[in-house]
């Protein structure tokens, strides 16, 4: 029986998931999104691989009604980046780096039950591994067990859960994934070893557990084409490593990191989705535009005509580049920091409604300021109600706060930014990259699948 299952998987993998975002296909329609219905979910834990195989990635995405990020918790780490919303601290004892290191309380099961009660049914767990692995990528057992415990908190509430690799790929000096620019092979070895252990730990979990390859990684200094080649190679290695682990990982739905999580850069034809079995890969990008409103309280109001039009333009870009070509999309992070509460709520509702209408799920970034993890209350209270409206399926236009046009400048946002912890570099040159000694290790390789 195992040989038959392996043979089936090998045949499916040869067909490819969606290797190129530029391929054409018939535009998506609602009946295609939901064709086949929604399979029953086994909240007790294990689900047969055949059930996971029958449920498409787009169905998974649409089942995620309201998503939420457990920010500033499991991704806590030492950082020497000044500002940019990463606490700049130097611990006296490296062992003190745990989920409370950036000021939030230890994660409890009660937190996820309260989130569920409020309407959240999907959670993304940003996890930084670099403080808990050795030089080969072997994970500290206690840390991996704690990660599993937190996963179980959410999973046992019936939530969808996304596990990701977080500040291991950020732009500070300890973000080891960026070393792939100089040492591709060794960095890839650490990366695949890390994911092999994570995959093995969670191999029996059903379709409500998803893995995300990495968070907002761009390879600064790699030079245009080379940066895309490196990311594409790592994403392919991620897929192949998980698939080769066996168990439910042969069919697990996987979330693929876009280039720097930036919509414009990811819609670039140089970005490629990895080869995989059909309908089991999902694209991940972020939306933090404009940065003066989303990342800092420099701009306190949002919602004039040009700002709304830019949001619509970017979501349409995702729709035509990926969704209409059979590639599901999740905006795994979005949020706002402007001081005007009405503007923040309007921004979140507008984005969520627009995405939902285009078959995209969204995950609110929360560093502890949106949902208080002690009192278990939303700030402002209207935020969660707005998200419920936006994901209700009802046809309506979110109501813009009064006087927004007078409070905001009628100017097109100049650039797209990343999640609130790191600002990505400017778009790299489009001209062909000339290889140097620093970047000429080896070309990214596509691993041969071991599953068949």
Residue ranges and their predicted role:
Residues 26-122:
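N-terminal carbohydrate-binding accessory modules
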Residues 101-122, 133, 137-167, 175-210, ...:
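An active-site-proximal structural segment forming one wall of the substrate-binding cleft
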Residues 2-10:
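Sec-dependent signal peptide recognition
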Residues 42-44, 185-299, 314-337, 357-360:
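Active-site region of glycoside hydrolase catalytic domains
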Residues 1, 20-46, 401-452:
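Intrinsically disordered, low-complexity repeat and linker tracts
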Residues 311-386:
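Substrate-binding cleft of secreted/luminal carbohydrate-active enzymes
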Residues 15-16:
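C-terminal motif of bacterial Sec signal peptides marking the signal peptidase cleavage site
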């Amino acid at each position: 029986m195992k040989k038959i299952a392996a043979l089936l998987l090998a045949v499916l993998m040869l067909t490819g998931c969606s290797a190129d975002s530029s391929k054409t296909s018939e535009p998506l329609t609602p009946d295609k999104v939901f064709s086949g219905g929604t399979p029953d979910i086994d909240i007790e834990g294990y689900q047969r691989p055949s059930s996971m195989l029958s449920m498409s990635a787009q169905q998974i995405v649409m089942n995620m009604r309201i998503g939420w990020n457990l920010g500033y918790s499991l991704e806590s780490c030492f950082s020497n980046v000044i500002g940019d919303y990463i606490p700049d601290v130097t611990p006296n004892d490296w062992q003190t780096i745990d989920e409370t290191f950036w000021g939030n309380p230890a994660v409890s099961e009660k937190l996820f039950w309260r989130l569920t009660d409020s309407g959240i049914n999907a959670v993304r767990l940003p996890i930084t591994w670099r403080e808990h692995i050795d030089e080969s990528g072997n994970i500290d057992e206690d840390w991996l067990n704690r990660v599993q415990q937190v996963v179980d908190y959410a999973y046992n509430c019936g939530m969808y859960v996304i596990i990701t690799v977080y500040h291991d790929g950020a732009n500070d000096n300890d973000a080891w994934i960026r070393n792939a620019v100089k040492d591709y092979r060794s960095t890839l070895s650490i990366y695949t070893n890390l994911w092999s252990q994570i995959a093995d730990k969670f191999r029996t979990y059903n379709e409500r557990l998803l893995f995300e390859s990495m968070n907002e990684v761009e390879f600064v200094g790699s030079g245009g084409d080379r940066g895309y080649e490196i990311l594409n190679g790592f994403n392919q290695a991620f897929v192949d490593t998980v698939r080769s682990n066996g168990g439910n990982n042969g069919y697990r739905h996987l979330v693929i990191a876009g280039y720097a999580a930036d919509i414009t850069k990811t819609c670039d034809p140089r970005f490629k989705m990895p080869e995989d079995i059909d309908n089991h890969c999902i694209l991940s990008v972020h939306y933090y535009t404009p940065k003066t409103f989303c990342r800092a309280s420099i701009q306190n109001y949002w919602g004039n005509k040009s700002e709304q039009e830019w949001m619509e333009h970017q979501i349409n870009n995702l729709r035509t580049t990926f969704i209409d070509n059979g590639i599901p999309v999740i905006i795994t992070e979005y949020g706002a920091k402007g001081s005007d509460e009405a503007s923040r709520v309007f921004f979140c509702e507008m984005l969520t409604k627009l995405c939902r209408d285009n078959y995209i799920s969204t995950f609110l970034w929360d560093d502890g300021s949106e949902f208080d993890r002690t009192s278990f209350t939303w700030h402002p209270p209207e935020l969660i109600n707005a998200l419920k409206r936006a994901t209700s399926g009802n046809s309506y236009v979110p109501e813009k706060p009064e006087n927004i046009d007078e409070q905001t400048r009628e100017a097109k946002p100049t650039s797209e930014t990343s999640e609130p912890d790191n600002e990505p570099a400017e778009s790299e040159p489009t001209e062909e990259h000339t290889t140097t000694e620093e970047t000429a290790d080896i070309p990214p390789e596509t691993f041969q699948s071991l599953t068949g």
